Amino acid sequence: MAENGQNCDQRRVAMNKEQYNGNFTDPSSVNEKKRRDREERQNIVLWRQPLITLQYFSLETLVILKEWTSKLWHRQSIVVSFLLLLAVLTATYYVEGAHQQYVQRIEKQFLLYAYWIGLGILSSVGLGTGLHTFLLYLGPHIASVTLAAYECNSVNFPEPPYPDQIICPDEEGTEGTISLWSIISKVRIEACMWGIGTAIGELPPYFMARAARLSGAEPDDEEYQEFEEMLEHAETAQDFASRAKLAVQNLVQKVGFFGILACASIPNPLFDLAGITCGHFLVPFWTFFGATLIGKAIIKMHIQKLFVIVAFSKHIVEQMVAFIGAVPGIGPSLQKPFQEYLEAQRQKLHHRSEMGTPQGENWLSWMFEKLVVVMVCYFILSIINSMAQSYAKRIQQRLDPKEKTK
């Protein structure tokens, strides 16, 4: 591995010399120009330059579509095979017969798995900012199942409508029959699929860094450029953030599989750096992905799942509501919406949502719905800004050779 890294470094040095036409350019001036270009790109956002941002976003979209069209055109055999497979699956889906019961069962499981894996990928990739799908989707789902399990004294919710809607079964269990393990088992599939999605979402930084190291080319990714700058200034790093990043990099590089497993198992915002580090130091794919998959889909997922289940268990929730009511002065007014929300959820579980309480919307659920809308909108805005900045970088890269020849 060390020999491969040395060869890659030699190729990169050679390419840098060719890039500057044999002239030894001061590295500080090159870094200063990169910094100015990065700051210029960071100003291309919707709330500062809306027209330019939308224009660059549209042009970047067209460039990406053109690139993908070209790739698909050069892989016609794969495209034709995929279309034939799609035609066979479509015919199987719509043709009546005894096989339809199996088709419906497979469709249900496929959509369930695809939904949670997709949310996991969105949480990891994000194109600049992750869509925090654990807080928005998986966490509330686990909390709902936990509250329903303690209210119904059972996890055998009728299917359908579960998982779209949770209602108590006609024959409810006896008090105290619900265990922590039964709730963990009920949400295991959703949680594991979400964890698999987050592991898949960590692959792009790994492949980008690995390709850049093998080819010796300068990648377009700013995180990778920051990673290289961090390695160059490793000895002089003083701030906490830089030392934390270096600690992750050293752990992954020196410990290998178990270092990656440790980073993936503990919730932390620095795991993208682990993917870049593994790619940069040419860690084998299955070592990286295997450790990431085990860490995120099994260990980390059970930690997060256990935390949510304990936090939303019946006695903890009742204690929290009582604690809110004990706040001097404003306690009762703050406690009331929580009590109304919990009572409304209990009535829904027992098929009594149409009677007993008014149908007016609780402000607690209203706030959560608006929070989801705001976070999804911010995620979409971040994608637009990121793609616009990518197109601005294309323009800067086209202008650089012209500037050097002046």
Curated annotation (Swiss-Prot):
Keywords: Acetylation, Autophagy, Cell adhesion, Cell membrane, Endoplasmic reticulum, Lipid transport, Membrane, Transmembrane, Transmembrane helix, Transport, Vacuole
Transmembrane segments: 44-63, 78-98, 110-130, 251-271, 274-294, 307-327, 364-384
Ranges in the topological domain labelled Extracellular: 64-77, 131-250, 295-306, 385-406
Keyword Transport: yes
Region VTT domain, residue ranges: 173-316
Record's catalysed reaction(s): a 1,2-diacyl-sn-glycero-3-phospho-L-serine(in) = a 1,2-diacyl-sn-glycero-3-phospho-L-serine(out); cholesterol(in) = cholesterol(out); a 1,2-diacyl-sn-glycero-3-phosphocholine(in) = a 1,2-diacyl-sn-glycero-3-phosphocholine(out); a 1,2-diacyl-sn-glycero-3-phosphoethanolamine(in) = a 1,2-diacyl-sn-glycero-3-phosphoethanolamine(out)
Keyword Transport: yes
Localization terms from the record: Endoplasmic reticulum-Golgi intermediate compartment membrane; Cell membrane; Vacuole membrane; Endoplasmic reticulum membrane
GO CC terms in record: autophagosome membrane; endomembrane system; endoplasmic reticulum; endoplasmic reticulum membrane; endoplasmic reticulum-Golgi intermediate compartment membrane; membrane; nucleolus; phagophore assembly site
Domain of life: Eukaryota
GO molecular function: phospholipid scramblase activity
Residues with PTM N-acetylalanine: 2
Membrane topology: Multi-pass membrane protein
Domain commentary: The VTT domain was previously called the SNARE-assoc domain. As there is no evidence that this domain associates with SNARE proteins, it was renamed as VMP1, TMEM41, and TVP38 (VTT) domain.
Role this protein plays: Phospholipid scramblase involved in lipid homeostasis and membrane dynamics processes. Has phospholipid scramblase activity toward cholesterol and phosphatidylserine, as well as phosphatidylethanolamine and phosphatidylcholine. Required for autophagosome formation: participates in early stages of autophagosome biogenesis at the endoplasmic reticulum (ER) membrane by reequilibrating the leaflets of the ER as lipids are extracted by ATG2 (ATG2A or ATG2B) to mediate autophagosome assembly. Regulates ATP2A2 activity to control ER-isolation membrane contacts for autophagosome formation.
Family according to the record: Belongs to the VMP1 family.
Subunit structure: Interacts with BECN1. Interacts with TJP1. Interacts with TP53INP2. Interacts with TMEM41B. Interacts with ATP2A2, PLN and SLN; competes with PLN and SLN to prevent them from forming an inhibitory complex with ATP2A2. Interacts with ATG2A.
Name of protein: Vacuole membrane protein 1
Organism: Bos taurus (Bovine)
